[in-house]
Amino acid sequence: MVKIISDSTCDLSQEVLERYDIDIIPLHIVKGDEELEDGPQIDIHALYEWADKNKTTPKTSAPSIETAMNVMRPYIDEGREIICFSISSEMSTSINVIRMAAEELDAEDKVTVIDSRNLSTGIGLLVVEAAVMAADGKSREEIKTGIDELIPKVRASFVVDTLVYLYRGGRCNAVSALIGGALALHPMIVVKDGKMDASRKYRGKIGKVIKNYAKDLEEDLKNARPDRVFITHSECDARTVEEVRDYIASLGIFKEIIETRAGGVISSHCGPGTLGVLFIAK
């Protein structure tokens, strides 16, 4: 069976990773002189406290080649083929590191590296689809073809409580135009062509903004594939998250609504109070 691997920016929970037998290659987070591997052990609240205290955003970087090799090696040694997903190449060099790791293992003919053109559970949606296909006995080529068809259909967006983290991180150029005197704005950030861009803008308290954002997605949600939808957030109010879940459930579209928390890398760039609804269009 083809082994499915992703870098850590897919933001899939440990339960989902175990259910679908997915392995993770961690990116790195740098807080001053301290370097951490992205993963469930990262204390997101402490990450934000450090950022606010130091008035800066943690730096993030691609995995090391050694780490990527160590994750892939056992499966190569077993003679298995691998499909490995990376965050959009427009946002990180993670994909290059994974490709170099495959070369170092002399396994280019056994490893397919896919540029998700996305982030967070926008990647996670593709990773889970690939894992389902692998479990169904599909070949590496068949999985790659299926995923290539799905990549442009992924709908990834989120709203943020503060523009500061996106601005400091420099990953969304549109935020620079909003930052001057517009800190009360809560933009809807969408992933398009592998990059982040600002879409519609909301004003008001973040709890109300998040609920309006979810309702504004209704027509798109009605045209989504019904298998699953992700609600992914970072340090969001639990009641607000539950209200979004209840609203999506009330539409009666999805077989599964999966709540996940954004990992360390994604949280470092989006900031606290961020929530996204991510799905695949039909």
Located regions from the model:
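Short, flexible active-site-proximal loops enriched in glycine and acidic residues
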Residues: R80-C84, K110-D115
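Class I S-adenosyl-L-methionine
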Residues: E35-E104
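Mixed-charge interfacial surface used for oligomerization/domain docking
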Residues: K3, T9-D23, H28, E34, ...
